[in-house]
């Protein structure tokens, strides 16, 4: 087996290994999306007051996942209603 053929096979093997390892992450992400789509997991939603700021905390109840705190800015004005008949 020539040296260039061997190095080509090594590159192809590494490329296939890279694709397989990236598909593992995609499969777990697809599982997470599918579980949210079918609502198999309940999600806790809590209003958290931290130093005068209102935040919404989301976390999985059944899965025991880590709770993620997300900031939601308060609207500065009332949004317009476009479908109101005059």
Curated annotation (Swiss-Prot):
Lineage: Eukaryota, Viridiplantae, Streptophyta, Embryophyta, Tracheophyta
Disruption phenotype: Reduced hypocotyl bending and dose-dependent altered root gravitropism associated with an altered PIN2 traffic that impairs the formation of auxin gradients, thus leading to an irregular waves root shape.
Protein name: Protein GOLVEN 1
GO biological processes: cell differentiation; lateral root development; positive gravitropism; positive regulation of cell population proliferation; regulation of asymmetric cell division; regulation of auxin polar transport; regulation of lateral root development; regulation of protein localization
Gene coding for it: GLV1
Tissue specificity note: Expressed in stems, hypocotyls, cotyledons, leaves, flowers, shoot apex, siliques, stamens and petals.
Cleavable signal peptide: 1-29
UniProt entry keywords in alphabetical sequence: Differentiation, Endoplasmic reticulum, Growth factor, Hydroxylation, Secreted, Signal, Sulfation
Other comments on record: 'Golven' means irregular waves in Dutch.
Family recorded in the similarity comment: Belongs to the RGF family.
Residue ranges of the propeptide: 30-70, 84-86
Name of a matching Pfam family: GLV1-2
Compartmental location: Endoplasmic reticulum
Predominant subcellular localization, coarse grouping: endoplasmic reticulum
Sites bearing Sulfotyrosine, chain numbering: 72
Residue(s) carrying Hydroxyproline: 80
Membrane-spanning segments: none
Top-level taxonomic group: Eukaryota
Keyword Transmembrane helix assigned: no
Alphabetized InterPro entries for the sequence: GLV1-2 (IPR049306)
Induction: Rapidly induced by auxin.
């Amino acid at each position: 087996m020539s040296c260039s053929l061997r190095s080509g096979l090594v590159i192809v093997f590494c490329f296939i290994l890279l694709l397989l390892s990236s598909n593992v992450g995609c499969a777990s992400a697809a599982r997470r999306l599918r579980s949210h789509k079918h609502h198999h997991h309940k999600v806790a939603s809590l209003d958290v007051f931290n130093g005068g700021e209102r935040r919404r905390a989301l976390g999985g109840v059944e899965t025991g996942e880590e709770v993620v705190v997300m900031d939601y800015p308060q609207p500065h004005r009332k949004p317009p209603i476009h479908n109101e008949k005059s």
